[in-house]
Amino acid sequence: MKAVDLFCGCGGMSLGFQNAGVEVLAAFDNWEPAINIYKDNFTHSVIDCDLNDSDAVAKIKAYNPNIIIGGPPCQDFSIAGSRNMGERANLTIRFAEIVSEVKPTWFVMENVYNIERMPILPKAKCIFKKAGYGLTVRILNASHCGVPQTRRRFFMIGLLDAKDDFLGRALDLALLETPMTVQDYFRDCVGEPLDTTFYYMHPRSYNRRGVFSVDEPSATIRGVNRPIPQGYKKHHGDKADPSKGGVRELTTKERSYIQTFPIDFRLEGIKTDVEQAIGNAVPVKLAEFVAARITDYSRR
């Protein structure tokens, strides 16, 4: 199976599919910091390209992929509300248009879990259905897919001339019964435990907790990484009180591990850009989980 990755970022989706045995032929993005990280970690081409450009489809067709994968940027509905989604929503439609024109056998579209509440999704589905794709749709909790993180993400998997929900049972049966914890992942996959029992992750708002235990999955890794603010007031859900010590923020590398990037994955660049690239990425093992179900199905 040969793939092209659209909106590839720093390469989480690409690496997950590679790990499942898919050959990634090329990747496309137009954010330079992420492209530079991608180049440092993959041998195939990554093309700096605005996928709205008129020649984008021809560039993708040249690789003759039988699967297109990608996570078109789409602002979280909880942030955007009912406002016009604008350019980011258009990228979801653009992804659907590209797939319908290139016509690979398969496609995988990843997005924010609450895209199902956005008016853009029915429009994208309509494009895929008109192109002849059967669709499997799932909201996957990454912690049940081998990722130590309660990140919920939307996946739409398309296969030409298939019935809808063709892959649903395979996805459901493969989910882990017990969520992956930070402690278990660091011990089993990183090779050494995290040197703290409690850590701080800057919450989206102070209505949410910021202190977590290694004996649970982390919250969603976002594109910001800040130290514990002076005078931080303990949230009722915090697993420890930072004012009493024993709590620290995670390093950039540790955050990449929670996104299930491997130890040898290179992360060079301005710190804020690297943090953003890590937070934007599809967790490697989440992508690998989906890819493995696809490769198993395709061998039938």
What residue ranges belong to the model's regions?
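S-adenosyl-L-methionine-dependent DNA methyltransferase catalytic core
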Residues: 1-24, 127-131, 153-300
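Short amphipathic alpha-helical segments
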Residues: 18, 39-40, 80-82, 120-122, ...
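The conserved SAM/SAH-binding core of class I Rossmann-like methyltransferase domains
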Residues: 27-28
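Conserved SAM/SAH-binding beta-strand->alpha-helix loop
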Residues: 31
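Short, conserved SAM-binding/catalytic segment
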Residues: 38-46
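Hydrophobic anchor residue in the Rossmann-like NAD(P) cofactor-binding loop of oxidoreductases
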Residues: 51
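Class I S-adenosyl-L-methionine
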Residues: 54-65, 72-220, 224
